[in-house]
Amino acid sequence: MSELHKPINASIRIRIRFDMTQQQTPPVVLVDGSSYLFRAYHALPPLMTSKSHPTGAIKGVISMIRKLEQDFPGSKMVVVFDAKGKTFRNDLYEDYKATRPPMPDDLAMQIQPIHDMVRAMGLPLLIVSGVEADDVIGTLAHEATSKGIDVVVSTGDKDMAQLVSDHVTLINTMTDTRMDRDGVVEKFGIGPEQIVDYLALVGDKVDNIPGVNKCGPKTAVKWLQAWDNLDNIIEHSDEVKGKIGEYLREAIETLPLSRQLATIKTDVDLEFGLEDLKLRTQDDGQLLELFREYELRSWIAELENSDSADEKSADDAVDNSTNPASKEKTYTIVTDQAELDTWIDRLNKAPLFAFDTETTSLRYMDADVVGVSFAIEPGEAAYVPFGHDYMGAPEQLDRETVLNQLKPLLEDPKKAKLGQNLKYDKNVLANHGIHLEGIAEDTMLESYVLNSVGSRHDMDSLARQYLGEQTITFESIAGKGAKQLTFNQIDLEQAGPYAAEDADITLRLHQALRPQLEKTGRLRDVYENIDLPLVPVLSRMEQRGAMISASTLRKHSQELAERMAELEKEAHEEAGESFNLGSPKQLQAIFYDKMGLPVVKKTPKGAPSTAEPVLQELAHEHTLPRLILEHRSLSKLKSTYTDTLPELIHHRTGRIHTSYHQAVTATGRLSSSEPNLQNIPIRSEQGRRIRQAFVAPEGYKLMAADYSQIELRIMAHLSGDKGLLKAFEKGEDIHRATAAEVFGVAVDDVSGDQRRSAKAINFGLIYGMSAFGLGRQLDVGRNQAQEYIDRYFERYPGVLKYMDSIRKQAHDDGYVETLYGRRLYLPEINARNKQLQQAAERTAINAPMQGTAADIIKRAMVSVEDWLQEHHQDDARMILQVHDELILEVRESAVDKIREGLEKRMSAAASLDVPLLVEAGVGNNWDEAH
């Protein structure tokens, strides 16, 4: 048997190991907890518990410490964090760290749990007032090396490079890198003993260390290479020419201070020494309690399954045999027909199997299948390659033969399949004449339904969160950028473990996620009855695509270009000079320096902003911002739609094929890309022109059906307000009825302006709009807007009562729900920052309505597609979904019966206390049908 035919044991954990045979005493490991705290917070997705407690930093920091325990068995390990309050550096320099923003609330909430876990792990935890964690680490490192003990400092802080010596090494577990003396020279171009002077020269904006103005790393290194140290640089400062020389001489008085601030102390007067810092026995009971509280599921399983759960020494705090990331896996590359037959037989007998395709492209219309992978049991998976065609590629089974053999299995609806984003696999297999059926589970959707905002829902992120594993990344085997290989070009010995791991991880993720869905029946119902049945519906819509008129778009694009040229000319005349309308820097100079317009808002760097909300405010009083806004709007339409849509017409079908995304938005709404249909303007003339380019094929019409005021109807249902319910039951114009109530006039006497104001109030309150926001929209004062809101709630008290109750529920539970039980978690609902809390409250009010609307349109899509597939396959096909609208291609002879059936099924998608009205239009293009 060749090496290729042998099972491959895939090891996915990269370890940093020191040669323990060269030293009798293991190194002391000093962990810079504060450094990892911030890095984990910013690097990892914003994970949360079911009660909305953030856990991203907890997971990140504890993962790093656990990895260090594995990599340095037997070593004394000490974890150091910064103390609250000022340090001696603030006494030296009052402005030290003065400009650093406060710690985010959702990070501050994670510090105590991290401290508790470190202590439960039996590790010494140090927090020393008056100094920083760096100084404590520097002092302990100095003590250890003076006793002949080597030191490993685990940190992500570049300042620590000054501690490196022949006996002190830095490691960064986030990047799996180590830095000894040679590493410092390689990274910085100078030795460890020069790092402090380097830091003094370049300064630190975050810590507010002055440094030398405009002196970057290259300049500092050049000076240090020439003159060795800061004192010599100061002595030779007159030899530095140009502006940078002036800056250096200006900084001479403050450079000693900068050096003092940058120097890590190695002589802190600690009340303890290394001898006093004892490792204790890990408290598994306490640790298990903490892991459960913060829902760290993979670690819970490790502790519960450990043979030594009652008595575990600090020296073997992490046992590889119980760590899912380090268990041996059997991944097989199948290149033998007999072995394939064996796997297919097993798959046919399995109640559920994980399935994945490897392809040549992420674009489903262009992708060819290179191989397929399967998993039935955790830790065992197979990859069947048949399309690797690089030079020297080993012999593989024939693609057509394999796919024909798999076709009955893959098309059997009774054979349950599990995958990660199976919609993509279904689309790709369709390119090869296979119609995937039996989609029983999808881990991407399981994760999304459990918590739409808690994590990214890609497999790599989910593996880290739920399994505690780092998967093999595509970039690690294919490379990056322009030179990245497609999967058919990747060496089979690398491609095999990667592909097999995909199936294995998917299976194990399902085993972790499905039980959580089962715990909450309503979430399980959302998954099983709404999101999962939608997968084949969206797949068929994507494959069908939509026809567009390239000539219509080209003509529109030319008109946009002409109008943009006119706007540019008008803007230049208004400004009194030519400038680039797309340059924020030039706009700042024109607006604020030349024209003296008021500064509404500044950028994070302190420059006057030219962002769209600022221009909208300025446009009320000034012509130039209005011209810029219109130019930007047309430029975006041109680049995003009129120029781009013709390029997206697929050569094989003559249609455009969008991609719908089920696991992106927080509320459950679908999003789309290539093209993004959701961003086509709804009410503007330019948006109408783009919709005119979506056309019906010969013999067909386009039918567009959408829900009338669905979110307001949902508000009436959820709030139970008698006034709103009555207005909808009577079929009244809800905006006219609201205007009559708010302005105290008869319905027949409502003016156009009053109706427009009432419409703004109706929709504004749904989105939690404040009096200030409503006033800006209606162009009235804040007091007047508040009066409108007060009158609205006087007339519709049930709405106010509902909003108050939903705010309270959000604060109590940390989430809100749609009518069908979909949850939206609100991590900032109890934030100390009032602005964040108020924003979360506005989301809490709107999310149940927007999310329920999303659930209803999804239910309608499944119902309509089932009806069309069963009764009208030749008469109509659903091709697009945008917001609350469905677009169908309908045979001209079947328009009336399809319209009747479509409106009936869409109206029946939900049972509300008010009628759910659907309006369907018909035309030769989308605009006519809209």
What are these regions (language model features)?
Residues 21-24, 47-48, 98-270, 464-466:
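Extended two-metal-dependent nuclease catalytic cores across DNA- and RNA-processing enzymes
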Residues 22, 26-29, 33-78, 94-106, ...:
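Conserved RNase H-like, two-metal-ion catalytic cores of nucleic-acid enzymes
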Residues 78-82, 127-129, 152-156, 354, ...:
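Acidic beta-strand-to-loop metal/phosphate-binding motif
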Residues 95-109, 113, 161-190, 245, ...:
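Short alpha-helix plus adjacent loop in nuclease-associated cores
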Residues 151, 355, 441-443, 697-709:
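Conserved catalytic palm subdomain of right-hand nucleotidyl-transferase polymerases, strongest
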Residues 562-569, 573-626, 794-842, 846, ...:
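C-terminal polymerase-core module
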